[in-house]
Each structure stands twice: as C-alpha cells, then as structure tokens.
Design a protein with these regions (language model features):
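Catalytic toxin/effector domains delivered as secreted proteins or via bacterial secretion systems
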Residues: 1-150
Length: 150
C-alpha cells in the first residue's frame, strides 16, 4: 500500500496508468469507553473513489448523510466499506476496504493473529473500536464538507 498507487492488481490488462486509490492520513482523536478517555489516533489509508453523492435506494440517504451519522459509505461493490486493521490490533493502522475484498481475502488479511487472538475478544477494545468507527466516519464526512480529502 505504501504510496497508495495501484497499477497491477485490479487494473485494466495492459494498462500502464497508475491510479491513486489510497491516501494515507493520520486521524487524531479520543473516545470514552466505560467513562475512561482513550486515544484512538492512528494512520488510515483512505479510499479516493468514494462517491459521496451515491444514494442508497433502501433509505434514500446519500453516502455523505450516512457518514454524518457515523455509518460507513457504500463502496463500488454496493456494500458498506469496512475498516480493516492492517496489523490486527486495536489501536493500529487501518485501510478503508470493500466488504467483498475483505471477505474474499479474509484468511490472508487476518493471518497475523491465531484463532481466538482477536482484539474483539476484549470487550473494552471492541467497544473502543466501535466508538472509533462512528467517530471516524463522521470526521471523514466533515473533512469532505471542508473540501479536504476529495
């Protein structure tokens, strides 16, 4: 992922065009878990292909409206984007990833931890992550409205 450039996997066969899919940013913030303030700052590799004006046919909401409420936007696969922990730890670097990609490569993407070693088994860390997700998508929407990360 490093540079955020993509010119092989998933590109048109024979294409020499480099498409910038990800932009690395540093998210800074805190959340409360059981009344305790926790630092949730981390690097996030943001997708550059989110359609903020996409309208969900079931709810009539745009991706931007979803994000302002703390929900993930829909990706090109028609499913909400997911935040993948690249090092499989909370707090750690993350990437905005399509749900279908996350599922297809689940064994590879989650191979750093053994069975039962997920941070999700820790109720406080799981709660922290869920709070982070909502805060992150709200923040991401605000960045878009300010003209940043478009």
């Amino acid at each position: 992922m490093g540079t955020g450039f993509h010119g092989g996997f998933g590109s048109t066969k024979g294409s020499r065009i480099k498409i910038r899919i990800f932009t690395p940013i540093y998210f800074e913030g805190t959340v409360k878990v059981n009344g305790i303030v926790r630092d949730i700052s981390r690097r996030v590799y943001q997708r550059n292909d989110i359609n903020f004006h996409y309208i969900d046919k079931d709810t009539g909401q745009t991706n931007l409206q979803r994000m302002l409420k703390g929900n993930a936007p829909y990706g090109r696969d028609g499913k909400p984007l997911e935040l993948h922990h690249t090092l499989q730890k909370e707090v750690g670097p993350m990437v905005e990833i399509h749900e279908t990609t996350h599922q297809e490569y689940k064994r590879i993407l989650h191979g750093l931890r053994g069975s039962g070693e997920s941070f999700r088994n820790d109720k406080e860390l799981d709660s922290q992550y869920r709070n982070f997700k909502r805060a992150y998508w709200k923040w991401r929407a605000q960045q878009y409205l300010k003209g940043e990360n478009k």
